[in-house]
């Protein structure tokens, strides 16, 4: 046996696992085969535990397939072996391209803050909000991968996930995670030069530097940070001079093993007005979506927010609010703040009837905006078919998949029962609706396109 055994396993895992999972959990592993033992090295304990819990059966199964009774014993360790990691093909992930070999190799260098520099020290404005941490970020299925990736970056900046690109709609927690990473890095290394900013601040700083003939100082400032966290990168669109400068800053940071984290409201390749060479680099590390929170996560967010305010929020009230406000975390928190303020002003107990009254206009607006009829029209327009097709008996994939998507959205965004949804789709049985919902949930895990379609439609219907 040789190390090619692990390369064979990688190839199979690449085919079997969703691209994001492969990039996040499998690609960072290093392998060493000796004495009939295959040692897999994980960059930290978090990755080790996750891989061992989630993928050990997959890996052992492949070892048995390739080697039969001679399959090596699998061992996991934290750390890295003193050789170049096993290379995987650029096809490893459709959403996270493999950076050039020189950049990958640089990820094994010492952290930038451990290197001695001859340059005089600069004054850094961190702008990281200490209130946003991993501890008060409510994790759910919609943001689990994003939080896990951010946690790993905080523990190992400049490592496997560089750059980390988080994308999703407004108010879903992207900014919270940026600050959480910054706080995590500075907790580990208090002297780390971590800079958080909105992309427009980068543009403003560059303009001021040009006006003051201080562009070299601008370059040195941004290229000497240990971690650069930029929010809403889509605002670079059509700003050619800013893109040019950020392109060179990006390259300098990556070559220096300094961490970059970017956020956007859309997938990198869908950002209009940004140069292709930049969009390509955005995908060199790991790209992860944050989706609108599912019902259970929305309830958990409300309960945690109430607890932080020393407010007792009955579970049925949290469920009532979460079932009706679905678009994003910011909307949920705003609604809860209004409920709490009304309760404080009036001295009344927080009940469902009280919430109905306090959020009367907001709930009425939601019910008006999201109806099954509206969902059907939006989905039909999105997939360029007719509403009549969604209600028909046609079973071709070009019609069946949009119909399943519309049913899943109706269950997610309205308060209608499964039988009511079935009736609205040509008199279908409730079991058909249930199957459609489960199918879309499965496809969202397996297909980047379906995940994007679902997120785009949620965003359209909730706006």
UniProtKB/Swiss-Prot annotation:
Pfam families: Bac_DnaA, Bac_DnaA_C, DnaA_N. Residues 127-343 are annotated as: Domain III, AAA+ region. The keyword DNA-binding applies. One of its GO terms (cellular component) is plasma membrane. Gene3D superfamilies: 1.10.1750.10, 1.10.8.60, 3.30.300.180, P-loop containing nucleotide triphosphate hydrolases. Transmembrane segments: none annotated. InterPro entries: AAA+_ATPase, Chromosome_initiator_DnaA, Chromosome_initiator_DnaA-like, Chromosome_initiator_DnaA_CS, DnaA_C, DnaA_dom, DnaA_N_dom, DnaA_N_sf. One of its GO terms (molecular function) is lipid binding. Residues 83-126 are annotated as: Domain II. It comes from the Bacteria. Keywords: ATP-binding, Cytoplasm, DNA replication, DNA-binding, Lipid-binding, Nucleotide-binding. Residues 344-463 are annotated as: Domain IV, binds dsDNA. One of its GO terms (biological process) is DNA replication initiation. Residues 1-83 are annotated as: Domain I, interacts with DnaA modulators. Its main location: cytoplasm. ATP binds at residues 171, 173-175. It is found in: Cytoplasm. Belongs to the DnaA family. NCBIfam families: DnaA. HAMAP family: DnaA_bact. Domain I is involved in oligomerization and binding regulators, domain II is flexibile and of varying length in different bacteria, domain III forms the AAA+ region, while domain IV binds dsDNA. Plays an essential role in the initiation and regulation of chromosomal replication. ATP-DnaA binds to the origin of replication (oriC) to initiate formation of the DNA replication initiation complex once per cell cycle. Binds the DnaA box (a 9 base pair repeat at the origin) and separates the double-stranded (ds)DNA. Forms a right-handed helical filament on oriC DNA; dsDNA binds to the exterior of the filament while single-stranded (ss)DNA is stabiized in the filament's interior. Oligomerizes as a right-handed, spiral filament on DNA at oriC. This is Chromosomal replication initiator protein DnaA. It comes from Edwardsiella ictaluri (strain 93-146).
């Amino acid at each position: 046996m040789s190390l090619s055994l692990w390369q064979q396993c990688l190839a199979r895992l690449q085919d079997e696992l969703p691209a994001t999972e492969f990039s996040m959990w499998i690609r960072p592993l290093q392998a060493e085969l000796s004495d009939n033992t295959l040692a897999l090295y994980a960059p930290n304990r978090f990755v080790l535990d996750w891989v061992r819990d989630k993928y050990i059966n997959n890996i052992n199964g492949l070892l048995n397939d390739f080697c039969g009774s001679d399959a090596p014993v699998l061992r996991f360790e934290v750390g890295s072996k003193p050789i170049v990691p096993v290379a995987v093909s650029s096809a490893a992930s459709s959403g996270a391209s493999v950076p050039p070999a020189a950049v990958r190799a640089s990820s094994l260098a010492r952290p930038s803050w451990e290197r001695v520099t001859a340059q005089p020290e600069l004054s850094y404005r961190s702008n990281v909000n200490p209130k946003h941490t991993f501890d008060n970020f409510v994790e759910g299925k919609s943001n689990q991968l994003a939080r896990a990736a951010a946690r790993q970056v905080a523990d190992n900046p400049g490592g496997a996930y560089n750059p980390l690109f988080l994308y999703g709609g407004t108010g879903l927690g992207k900014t919270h995670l940026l600050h959480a990473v910054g706080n995590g890095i500075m907790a580990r290394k208090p002297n780390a030069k971590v800079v958080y900013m909105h992309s427009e601040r980068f543009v403003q700083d560059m303009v001021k530097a040009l006006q003051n003939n201080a562009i070299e100082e601008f370059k040195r400032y941004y290229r000497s940070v240990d971690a650069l966290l930029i929010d809403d990168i889509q605002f670079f669109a059509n700003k050619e001079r800013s893109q040019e400068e950020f392109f060179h800053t990006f390259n300098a940071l990556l070559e220096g093993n300094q961490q970059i984290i970017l956020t956007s409201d859309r997938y990198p390749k869908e950002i209009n007005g940004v140069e292709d060479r930049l969009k390509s680099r955005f995908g060199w590390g790991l790209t992860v979506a944050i989706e609108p929170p599912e019902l259970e996560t929305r309830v958990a967010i409300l309960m945690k927010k109430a607890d932080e305010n020393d407010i007792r929020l009955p579970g049925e009230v949290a469920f009532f609010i979460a079932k009706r406000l679905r678009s994003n975390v910011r909307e949920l928190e705003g609604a809860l703040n209004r409920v709490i303020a009304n309760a404080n002003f009036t001295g009344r107990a927080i009940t469902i009837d009280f919430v109905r009254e306090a959020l009367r206009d907001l709930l009425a607006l939601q019910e008006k905006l999201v109806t099954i009829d509206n969902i059907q029209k939006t989905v039909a327009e999105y997939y360029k078919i007719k509403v009549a097709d969604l209600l028909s008996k046609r079973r071709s994939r070009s019609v069946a998949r949009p119909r399943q998507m519309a049913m899943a959205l109706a269950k997610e965004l309205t308060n209608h029962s499964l039988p009511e949804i079935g009736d609205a789709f040509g008199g279908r049985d409730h079991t058909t609706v249930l199957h459609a919902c489960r199918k879309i949930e499965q496809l969202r895990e397996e297909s980047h396109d379906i995940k994007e379609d679902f997120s785009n439609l949620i965003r359209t219907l909730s706006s």
